[in-house]
Amino acid sequence: MNSTSIERPSVKLMITVMCATLYAVGSYMTAYIPSPWGFGQFRPAVVIPAFFAVVFGPQPAAVGAALGTLLVDSIKHGYIYPGSLIAAVPGNFLGFYLIGWFLWRKFSWSRFILISNIGLLVANIVVAFLYVFAYKVLYQSQYIGTSVSVLVALALGLTLFWFVTMLPFVLLITPTLIQVAVNTFPSFVSPDLIEALGRKVPGNELGVSMLGPGVILLVVGLLVTYTGLGSWMLNNPAFGAIAKSIIEVLCYVCGAVLSALGLYFFRRI
């Protein structure tokens, strides 16, 4: 197989099925680790469609991610899960299509870092807002009549949770997977990818991509602890005491880890 044979429909179908299967299996491993709100899972398996997007292009990655997330959500719930159909499927499709569109056969480390941030942010915003404003309002009666400000806060909280728990895995693990693919099957990898792997990952850009979200999370944690934001969360139906405490811990722990990683990569320059 070479890089041009990926365009063949049969090969593209096989790659799409592989992406969907691996993504579903990887996602199921953490399917029961929820967000602070009890729905929306911790999902480091996003490294799988990110890898497929870079190596095989936007279509196999986007379709594979959409099918994979629908499969794992449906297995978890025991039926075709409407929340996945309404929110997770379009969000995963759009996010990984963007990553593949901008990186496939146009790869550089700088683009990879930038587009990974953008793709994950777009995907998580789409999933969070569709899940809250479409699925929750349409299918769960307790959300009917909830104020828009509360729903927006919930969607933004989900977006933040997903983004900060996915980004480090994509930026740190995906390059290793790409390197393994290039070393194992160099004939079907595009020349620009092989060339890019011969260059050093830009530590300053990788550092900024980690340090920026890390500092933001630490600031949010401090605001929750020491300002009226914490009281607002306690009295907000979208949060409550348990969610507030989990978010507080999450902000400090993830913020410290991301900041430490960012500073580490800066020191390696």
What are these regions (language model features)?
Residues 1-269:
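Loop-helix junctions at membrane interfaces
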